[in-house]
Amino acid sequence: MTVRRLESKSEHISDDEERKEQLDYKKQMDVDTDRNIVLNGRLESQIAKLSVPPHEMRVVDDYSNSKNAERHSGEIQAYAKFAGSTWTYYVKKIRIILGREPANPSPKGKNEDLEVIDMNFGPSKVVSRKHAVVEYDLDDQTWNCSVYGRNGIKVDGKLFKNGETVKLTSGSILEVAGLQMMFVLPNAAEQKQTDESTIKEDAIKSEISAAVNDAAEYGDNKKPPYSYSVMIAQAILSSSECMMTLSNIYSWISTHYPYYRTTKSGWQNSIRHNLSLNKAFRKVPRKSGEQGKGMKWSIVPEFREEFIAKTRKTPRKRSPSSPVPLLAKKREGSPSLPIPILPKMKDTSIPAAEPASSTTSARDQTPSTPKDVGSPSTAETSAEEKQMETYKTPTHAALSDIISTHDYALDANSASQTKKAAFGSPIGSSTYPTSSPAPFWKYVAVPNPHDWPQVGSYDTISPYRNPVNSHLIYSQIQQSSPKKIDEQLHDLQGVDLVNGFEGISSWRESMVNKLRSSVSDSPTMNLANSNSKSSPVAVQRVSTLPQASANKQAKEMESKMSNSPTQKSKTEENNQAVRAILDASATMEKQYDLHRLPTPTSQTESASVPQIANPPNSQNLVKEKSPQQYIQVPQSNVKSSA
């Protein structure tokens, strides 16, 4: 009796299990059917929006939906279908040809070699006779489209030309000559939904598993680097249904993060508050027939990607008190875990300091002597670098030197002083003669009337203004006080480069006024007649005249100039006077270069001034210098053109 009771009881349990399985399967089928209806409705809405060209298309007329309804009744067995907005072509072969049939087909027998067109896109000649071939690949188990037409085919908006092959999937939209159609496989809605869900679930599982498995690296008393909301999302996404009760969330967190097993800091209250206050989480009712009480928690779809992205981020930096590496260890039987990306450290290493001799201060550089500041120094300095370091301003700066000459004077005695000055106190502005864009006319060596050489050495009137005496060749004698002139020119006549320069017009006027005052204050001298047949190198002897006769001649010349019909204004006279001075200075420099003789070197400062050979009969030259000596008096044997 007991055996029969046990058998009847077991049969009763087995019947109940079968009924339960049948009910579950029926419910699942109903859910899948409803889901397919929804997805098929979405596909139908997309197909209805496909474009149809205005010109005639045979495939649209031959396979319109109305004709298909007349041909077929009920379900249609086909491998796939090309669905347009008003037509549908069912694929019943594993290889079909898309093209255009000839307008006038020839009798049978002649076109036996030609392949039959399955989908006729004529009569438009935009489509080739054999435009494309769609066939099923048995090896890869995929549908492929090979293009043969000259105008190509667009698949999902991308143009594929002749000779190219594209893989077709369910939902791919093809466009031929402006006609759009969708390639749909059987149960495409279910397949598409399954593929998308599978891809998403795989991505979620991979991301969540990577984040969850990091918990194995956190032992006791090691707090995980995630916020409560992220840990809740990890727990929910780890389940197959993406739903979890509150108690299961507690157990999942305490299982994967041992820190929360021993701590009693009220983390469960924090979890509960996050679920109720965070809008990313919502309550979901249990399935019908599911055991248990209470509702489950899930993630709002809009925030799902956000939580997945947060799990990808590197955990926050640990404190120095617990320098535990965040590298995941590969365990046996578990998938390889991704290595967290460590934050990049900035290169804070200080470059090696260069020797002090490699850098050159700006005071040692001029536009004419550039240096590479950052170049590494060598033990021995080349001769060219030494010359650059001992550069000194020329003592005699003329207009020709500044414009066309680059041979600067080098003073060997001042080399050590220049090197010390580079690292000492600031140097005055006179050390920078060409360091600022100053007017170069300030550097012209205008001869001082008191320092002019003796009479007869050269002609002060420009050859252009006095063509009668243009045949004279000038020579300059040794200066009596070179030190005084050097200091005067080296200081640039009291001009400060920092504060700037005065205008050229005011400078001309001041120079002319100085010249006139010196002429009026100095004693007058007369020039003697010279022998016109003498050598051009020889200097003419001049005899002094009485004071009264000299004054008389000067007054006569002034009266002639005042009574001249070609009177000039004050500004023109000043300009002419300054121009004459500049011409005379340039001529002096030229003659100085021609008649300069080599002199023996000496240690004294006066040896730096070039020595000029004394002209013949130089002992009879008048030692007193006067501006009147530079006014050329017309000779008696020369008639004036006036």
Swiss-Prot record:
SUPFAM superfamilies (alphabetical): SMAD/FHA domain, Winged helix' DNA-binding domain
An annotated Gene Ontology molecular function: DNA-binding transcription repressor activity, RNA polymerase II-specific
Binding region for DNA: 223-318
Positions of the FHA domain: 96-160
Modification note: Phosphorylated. Occurs periodically during mitosis.
Cellular localisation: Nucleus
One Pfam family, short name: FHA
Amino acid composition bias (Polar residues), ranges on this chain: 363-381, 519-552, 599-642
Keyword NADP: no
One of the record's GO cellular component terms: M/G1 phase-specific MADS box-forkhead transcription factor complex
Sites of Phosphoserine modification: S319, S321, S322, S334, S336, S375, S535, S626
Composition bias type Basic residues, residue spans: 310-319
Biological process according to GO: division septum assembly; negative regulation of cell cycle switching, mitotic to meiotic cell cycle; positive regulation of induction of conjugation with cellular fusion; positive regulation of transcription by RNA polymerase II; regulation of transcription by RNA polymerase II
Positions with biased composition (Low complexity): 348-362
Keyword annotations: Activator, Cell cycle, Cell division, DNA-binding, Mitosis, Nucleus, Phosphoprotein, Septation, Transcription, Transcription regulation
Record's keyword annotation contains Glycoprotein: no
Function noted in UniProt: Required for promoter sequence element PCB-driven, M-phase-specific transcription. Acts as a transcriptional activator with a role in the regulation of mitosis. Binds, cooperatively with mcm1, the CLB cluster regulatory elements throughout the cell cycle. Regulates the periodic transcription of cdc15 and spo12. Required for the correct timing, positioning and contraction of the division septum.
Protein name stated in the entry: Fork head protein homolog 2
